[in-house]
Regions:
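Catalytic cores of RNA-modifying enzymes
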Residues: 1-214, 242, 269
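An accessory alpha-helical subdomain
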Residues: 190, 194-196, 200-239, 244-259, ...
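Short amphipathic alpha-helical segments
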Residues: 264-271
Length: 271
């Protein structure tokens, strides 16, 4: 079922499905944009797709046009019950009631979702860590938060960006104006893709992410002071900085993802 400006209120009112602020729900009501987002996923014949936070099914409608198996997951039982009725005759769409952060996502090769603000970082981290067969992910998030995942230096840079850049690459796709949603959020949204490299050593990348996560928890501390939590020995920290050609006075936001990988490998070899 296509969701658009003309039918949204009729459908939502008939099914008594008002947006829930607790779930950060803003429904996309521009089908042309929905189609662009789904097209950006580059779905291929054998892909297994998972959608998080389908709401009334704005993206699900276009996913259902493919012959691939798509699983849509939402924690809001109202939306789940609605979608189960809409797609009960479509064997390619599986509707699941669950918290995405408690869902087994390991089998899926493509991931898509309009992510609510309150779980954006947590959801993206969860997919990166657990969707081990994924090759591409396409998300829509509030534009003001995109830098957290795209930047590799500066005040918006953080551990999730480290993980993204060590597992693959990120690309900005397009911006969606606030008026394309109901209710309209306070800012525009950005659609972006994460491409996962199958040849990456996931274990090493995740280890580096854990180091970055710990260091960014004290982002105003210098790297040498931060590393005291790991090595407890100033001489060893000095040697690490010498061996890695790392300025000990740098702060976490000044360290590139590749250097976090080298720091992690060094720490693991000096346990």
């Amino acid at each position: 079922m296509e969701i658009n400006r003309s039918n949204f209120f009729e459908i939502a009112n008939k099914a008594d499905l008002k947006p829930d602020k607790d779930y950060g729900q803003n429904f996309l009501i521009e089908p042309q944009i929905c189609e662009r987002i789904v097209d950006a996923l580059n779905i291929e014949v054998n892909d297994k797709v998972i959608e998080v936070g389908p709401g009334l099914g704005s993206l699900t409608h276009f996913l259902s046009m493919y012959n691939n198996k798509s699983t849509v997951v939402d924690i809001d039982l109202r939306m789940i019950n609605f979608l189960k009725v809409v797609y009960k005759e479509n064997p390619n769409v599986e509707v699941v009631a669950n918290d995405i952060r408690k869902t087994d996502v390991s089998q899926y090769t493509k991931v898509i979702g309009n992510l609510p603000y309150n779980i954006t970082t947590e959801a993206i981290q969860y997919f990166l860590l657990n969707a081990t067969n994924a090759t591409r992910m396409v998300f829509m998030i509030q534009s003001e938060t995109l830098a957290h995942f795209y930047d590799v230096s500066g005040k918006e840079y953080g551990p999730t960006s480290v993980l993204i850049h060590l597992l693959g690459s990120i690309e900005k796709l397009f911006t969606v104006k606030a008026g394309s949603f109901y209710p309209a959020p306070k800012c525009s949204s950005s659609v972006f893709a994460i491409n996962l490299d199958a040849n990456v050593d996931r274990k090493s990348a995740i280890s580096a992410f854990m180091v970055a996560k710990a260091l960014f928890a004290n982002r105003r501390k210098t790297i040498s002071n931060n590393l005291m939590n790991y090595l407890k020995n100033k001489d060893t920290i000095n040697q690490l900085c010498i061996d890695l050609d790392l300025n000990p006075l740098l702060r976490p936001e000044q360290i590139a993802p590749e250097m976090y990988l080298r720091i992690s490998e060094y720490l693991n070899s000096h346990k």
